Amino acid sequence: MCKSDLHDFLHGLPKCEHHVHLEGCLAPDLIFELAKRNNVSLPNEPAYESIEALSHRYGHFTSLDDFLRFYFIGMSVLHHESDFADLAWAYFQKAHADGVHHAEVFFDPQVHRDRGIPYETIVSGFVAGCQRAERELGLTTRLILCFVRHLPVDNAARVYQEALDQEHFDNEVVHGLGWSSTEVGPPKDMFRELYSSASAKGIRLTAHAGEEGDPSYISAALELGAQRIDHGIRLVEDPVLMEKVVRDRIMLTVCPISNLQLRCVESIAHVPIRKFLDAGVMFSINSDDPAYFGGYILDNYCAVQEAFQLTVDEWRVIAENSIKGSWIGEERKTELLKRIDDHVQRHVAAV
């Protein structure tokens, strides 16, 4: 719970989450549970001696790549459709409790496929979790297939082709493509051909850029057709590019606690929330990999409020822009915008 007088307002504010990796919702207790269920041996090192030791280690990441090592080890416990469904359901319950009404979630099939897990097992499990969230919690959900930059392009191409062969984009089992993992090092345009193919088919595109990499990584992602930028905090270093992002209504999916935990910023106050608001940059606030970074979406909202002391009107702008930048139909957008307006009006009437 944040210390701000606006905590109850922030808790009840209808939220959209656009930047959360389902594999990043593998809490230590679930990792140990699934490892036991699936007879998976975890590494013989101090961090994996207990749930408590792993939780402690998660609070001391030194970089993006340090985090990614633990992230990919965690994935190794996921074997069966029910494992993926349980993981998704665990996230959606927490998101719902934090006031999320719509969630667009990443999944990383390449890493699982390299472990011998069939693509269909992965997708079927996550779809089951999404359907349960829609049925029992009233959330709307979208799955975004996420390429990883530390694996070869032909590896991503095989997964992309599987999704096409199963018509997952046409029948909206999968609603878009993204990329993530190591930012600095691999070629900025490594997915050029895949993004060109997807763009020609009308598939929605997003990309992790401008987290550790400089603004040129954002420019490269936009040039390849990205319609959203995940992270994007280094956009402020290029005023001309920032003007373009504002003009073209490109939404950033900002993850404040993640940026802090991975040492991208020295404090939440260094995340350019105020600069984005003043410049008119569209952005949403998200949790990224909440089980690893110790904060789900409400924790991120509270951290931003404690750092910036935003007004109700500023939060309204953030919430409304998060809806406008969502990959949902106009009817659902109108419904969610109405919920925000109702919530704001109730708050104003009560103070």
Swiss-Prot record:
The active site is at E211 (proton donor). GO terms for molecular function: adenine deaminase activity; zinc ion binding. Its EC number is 3.5.4.2. The record marks H231 as: Important for catalytic activity. GO terms for biological process: adenine catabolic process; hypoxanthine salvage; nucleotide metabolic process; purine ribonucleoside monophosphate biosynthetic process. GO terms for cellular component: cytosol; nucleus. Keywords: Cytoplasm, Hydrolase, Metal-binding, Nucleotide metabolism, Nucleus, Zinc. HAMAP family: Adenine_deaminase (MF_01962). Binds 1 zinc ion per subunit. Pfam families: A_deaminase (PF00962). It is found in: Cytoplasm; Nucleus. CDD domains: ADA. This is Adenine deaminase. It comes from Aspergillus oryzae (strain ATCC 42149 / RIB 40) (Yellow koji mold). NCBIfam families: aden_deam. PANTHER family: ADENINE DEAMINASE (PTHR43114:SF6). The keyword Zinc applies. Catalyzes the hydrolytic deamination of adenine to hypoxanthine. Plays an important role in the purine salvage pathway and in nitrogen catabolism.
